[in-house]
Amino acid sequence: MPRDVDAVYALLLGRSALQFMRQYQEFGLKGRVKLIGGGTTTDEHVLPFMGDEAIGAVTALHYSASLDTPANKAFAQAYRARFKKVPSYYSESMYTGGKWLVAAINAINGRVEDRAALLEALRSVRPSDLPRGPVELDAYGNPIENVYIRRVERVNGELQNTVIDTFPKVSQFWTFDPVVYLREPLYSR
């Protein structure tokens, strides 16, 4: 690896994230080259199995268990009480999906057999009090939501993804015009 790189970007899941963090430190890169990455690299489901090698890693994701909002605090507290662990992106996503579905079903008074009405309700509802913050769907059915920049820190003896910045209302197109963006050719190897 060239010595003048600004950072290493890692997007890993599960065991691979654990191994990578250890190897990053063992190879002497921690403290010398910034580590940035996708949120699953340091998700709360793997943090309990990591040590100080993860401290300082900066990742981006639409959820952090340490998000300081009333909705997330209530969710994280209830989750921890029931499952004896910190909620992860995966558990929060399932919870949010469930709240979304309930809101849509309520919006159509339970008429789930009316497929068109259910799909329209799923596209148009905006459930409140989601742990991750506000979410809505764009015209293409993809989420517009906050993306949190998180840094791994040790707080009260536990590793956590501390939110250090927020990009509000991020869509699949980021800052690009959707019409222009969709005219581009598909990615291909």
Task: Locate the predicted segments by residue.
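Extracytosolic ligand-binding ectodomains
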Residues: M1-R189
